[in-house]
Design a protein with these regions (language model features):
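Polyanionic/metal-chelating signatures
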Residues: 1-86
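Stable alpha-helical elements in mature extracytoplasmic
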Residues: 24, 28, 71, 98, ...
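Amphipathic coiled-coil/heptad-repeat helices and related helical stalk/stem segments
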Residues: 48, 71, 95, 127-128, ...
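Short acidic active-site motifs
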Residues: 51, 97-98, 131, 195
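His/Asp/Glu-enriched, well-ordered alpha-helical/loop segment
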Residues: 61, 103, 113-115, 123-210, ...
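Catalytic beta/alpha-barrel core
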Residues: 63-67, 85-94, 114-120
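Glycine-enriched alpha-helix->loop->beta-strand junction motifs that scaffold or abut catalytic
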Residues: 79-86, 103-110, 139-141
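Active-site-adjacent beta->alpha loops and helix N-cap segments on the catalytic face
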Residues: 94-104
């Protein structure tokens, strides 16, 4: 649903309350309860419940899409209530007041790419660039979600430049690079084979005459896949 009042219909422009929130939470809770009850039933025809088994057993990560404080706290609390610890937040744009909470629960964050408008009309225009540094300063594992631009091809092309843009707001270049290499590998659980240049790991190497994280000066001259 549209989060703000639809001014073209005469509604107030401010944020709207979700009057279906309690109902939606109950539906989600019912689904989790049914799934947990059926996950050991080998004859169950409820494929959704069967698919939840690795989630409850800690084999699969849950990606929680949440931006504001209440979403984050409610979402994490809900999942923790079912013994689910492998949680990654996607978004967390307005999470500054809950960074300690995120850190205490040992949760990684995939932040939104910075080439976008602020989350809210009254948000700091620089929040999109600064939130990643605030998370890293708290010791939170951070990566970047490249989606949100015109196409998947453009998003992937811009990924190194997103990291470069974050580095312009106080993040060390090496740490910014890790946001698109080492950190996502750890979040995905594939860091034994990918993410860093170490003996025995797989890697794609490239050589750039300019800054590979800078949209203007980068100039890739060699690539080894």
């Amino acid at each position: 649903p549209y989060p703000y009042g639809r001014w073209w219909l005469g509604e107030d422009r401010g944020l709207k309350a979700n009057h279906n929130y309690s109902k939606q939470v109950k539906e989600l809770k019912d689904f989790f309860e049914i799934s947990k009850a059926n996950m050991f039933n080998e004859n169950s025809m409820n494929l959704k419940s069967v698919a939840m088994k690795p989630v409850f057993e800690g084999q699969t990560t849950v990606y929680l899409y949440a931006d504001d404080e209440k979403e984050i706290v409610d979402g994490i609390t809900f999942l923790k209530g079912y013994g689910i610890d492998k949680i990654v937040i996607v978004g967390a744009t307005e999470s500054e007041s809950q960074l300690n909470f995120i850190k205490e629960n040992n949760i990684a964050v995939v932040v939104k790419q910075p080439y976008r408008f602020p989350q809210s009309t009254d948000s700091d225009p620089m929040e999109t660039f600064e939130i990643a540094k605030k998370m890293l300063d708290q010791g939170i594992l951070v990566s970047i979600d490249p989606t949100g631009t015109a196409s998947a091809r453009v998003s992937i092309r811009n990924l190194p430049f997103y990291a470069g843009s974050f580095s312009s707001y106080g993040i060390d270049k090496e740490i910014a690079l890790s946001m698109i290499t080492k950190n996502p590998s750890e979040i995905l659980g594939i860091d034994e084979n990918y993410g860093t240049l170490e003996v025995g790991k797989s890697a794609t190497l490239f050589v750039s005459k300019g800054d590979a994280l800078d949209i203007i000066s980068n100039n890739i001259i060699h690539a080894f896949i």
